[in-house]
Amino acid sequence: MAVSKFIQIRRDLHKIPEIGFKEWKTQQYILDYIGTLSNEHVEVKVWETGVIVKVNGKNPEKIIGYRADIDGLPITEETGYEFASIHEGMMHACGHDVHTTIGLGLLTAAVTERIDDDLVFLFQPAEEGPGGALPMLESEELKEWKPNIILGLHIAPEYPVGTIATKEGLLFANTSELYVDLKGKGGHAAYPHTANDMIVAASHLVTQLQSVISRNVNPLDSAVITIGKITGGTVQNIIAEKSRLEGTIRTLSVESMSRVKSRIEAIIAGIEASFQCEAVIDYGAMYHQVYNHEALTREFMQFVSEQTDMKVITCTEAMTGEDFGYMLQEIPGFMFWLGVNSEYGLHHAKLKPDEEAIEKAIVFLDQYVKWKGTRK
């Protein structure tokens, strides 16, 4: 059975996942598709490996923005798709192929039937890291086209197709990467008293970090410290001179993030003293919380509930990280979850979003944009 135009686009994009600021094929695919629209009212700019598109309205008084992240993840795909990734060790495991396809569908609808206001589409690289939203927002390319209102979405495997979920105010957490390098003194396994073992130091650090959440964060607040990777040592009979911990910090408040980092630094200083080692801390990429504009979100939820076929759910905050939060710091707007009904979750090698969600999203977002684009 033949698949629809936009499902085919999603499958094409799914084949070519690329990591942050290396999305060259994805960028070219987007540009090639936009070229097929060939409309005098469409303007295109390239920024890094992203694309910014403006559709000029008939009688513009504001600019409405839609942001789609376009990068993939360093994950080996296990979906069994015929259209699985052709890039070894990389996969669209967070739905950015779906986000981009919906953006192209919404762009197509906007070109086909122009609204009063201008529309700007931000096909943004590097959401998974090192972060593309903030530099794109600050770029010269976007300066003239900066939206007055902006919206974004993220697929949600746990919600059924035909459903969206969002809330006013805080939606996603503040996030920060965490990298700690420990350096001590290596030695022979038979003479531990002559060395400073960085495997043991790393083990103590991991267990002590967990006390930050239970003893330094308000129980009515939420925070997470996860160490996802530890490396160290060379062979079984040599005491490790170095070790490295890699993890993530997530909090629902800016104040908690500051407190958690302060406690991490104090604990690491204690590890340095206890194990006579040196430690270097790097917080890597840090994403601001996603905080939805209350009035716009409330208006959007009411519109979708009353004037479209989609079901609206009021959800709770999530510890998810999203650099779209930087855009919402400067531009009123909102983000929402789009139900895609997948057995496997985000960042899983077997994530399989239900493709029926794509055209449903294009249809109801087109309805919303046309409605919003004629309101003062």
From Swiss-Prot:
Active site: D69, E128
Descriptive protein name: N-acetyldiaminopimelate deacetylase
Catalyzed reactions per annotation: N-acetyl-(2S,6S)-2,6-diaminopimelate + H2O = (2S,6S)-2,6-diaminopimelate + acetate
Family, as annotated: Belongs to the peptidase M20A family. N-acetyldiaminopimelate deacetylase subfamily.
Pfam families: M20_dimer, Peptidase_M20
EC number, UniProt record: 3.5.1.47
InterPro entries: AcetylDAP_deacetylase, Amidohydrolase, Bact_exopeptidase_dim_dom, Peptidase_M20, Peptidase_M20_dimer
GO biological-process terms attached to the record: diaminopimelate biosynthetic process; lysine biosynthetic process via diaminopimelate
GO molecular function: N-acetyldiaminopimelate deacetylase activity
Enzyme class at the top of the EC tree: hydrolase
The protein's role, per its UniProt record: Catalyzes the conversion of N-acetyl-diaminopimelate to diaminopimelate and acetate.
Highest taxon, organism lineage: Bacteria
Entry keyword set: Amino-acid biosynthesis, Diaminopimelate biosynthesis, Hydrolase, Lysine biosynthesis
UniProt pathway: Amino-acid biosynthesis; L-lysine biosynthesis via DAP pathway; LL-2,6-diaminopimelate from (S)-tetrahydrodipicolinate (acetylase route): step 3/3
